[in-house]
């Protein structure tokens, strides 16, 4: 496992989380956002809660994800799960960076992030929740859904015909550039796909 993706025993991880997160939001405002990774009503969508003491994180989440406060409970009831994301920037001091951590608990569909402010490690619905979405597609919805690092775009042809394209590639290989070449841009990074009832 790379230094960016370490693995440890759950009990050891929880001890680290308790040690470093206990009281981390003291004197701060804890905010909670209710989001959906995908369209309301779609079988491959994933409801997610983001809990943070950072206005930057919640404001960014409101821009990047579907805020579904009114639809959250019905979606959870229908889909049978939701992802939980807990973050705090702590005191936001350079000396706390060695204590920064991001944990993913795949069994409990929960991510923890603390002592960091970088969007990739605080907007947990992207990286952390994508891991959970992949697990769900692979282990629970095999042959029904896919969660992948893909772009989706549509290119208009003669007579208004739209040819939909989907492409997978690792980071830094041109997904965004490829997706933006289309006339009907859907997404450039993470894709949730499913087979509709009509095939």
Predicted regions and their residues:
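Conserved internal helical-beta-strand scaffold that buttresses enzyme catalytic cores
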Residues: 1-173, 183-194, 199
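Hydrophobic positions on the alpha1 helix immediately C-terminal to the Walker A/P-loop
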Residues: 178
């Amino acid at each position: 496992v790379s230094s960016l993706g370490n693995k440890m025993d759950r009990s050891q991880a929880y001890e680290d989380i308790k040690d470093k997160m206990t009281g981390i939001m003291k004197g701060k405002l804890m905010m909670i956002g209710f989001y959906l990774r995908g369209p309301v009503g779609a079988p491959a969508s994933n409801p997610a809660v983001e809990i943070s003491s950072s206005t930057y994180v919640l404001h960014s989440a409101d821009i990047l994800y579907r805020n579904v406060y009114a639809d959250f409970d019905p979606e959870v009831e229908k889909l049978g799960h939701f992802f939980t994301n807990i973050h705090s920037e702590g005191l936001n001091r350079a000396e706390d960076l060695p204590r920064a951590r991001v944990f993913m608990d795949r069994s409990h569909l929960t991510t923890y992030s603390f002592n960091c402010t970088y969007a990739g490690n605080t907007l947990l619905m992207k990286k952390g929740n994508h891991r959970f979405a992949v697990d769900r597609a692979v282990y629970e919805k095999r042959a029904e859904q896919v969660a992948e690092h893909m772009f989706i775009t549509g290119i208009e042809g003669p007579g208004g015909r739209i040819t939909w394209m989907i492409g997978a590639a690792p980071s830094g290989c041109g997904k965004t550039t490829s997706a933006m070449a289309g006339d009907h841009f859907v997404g450039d990074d993470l894709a949730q796909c499913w087979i509709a009832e009509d095939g």
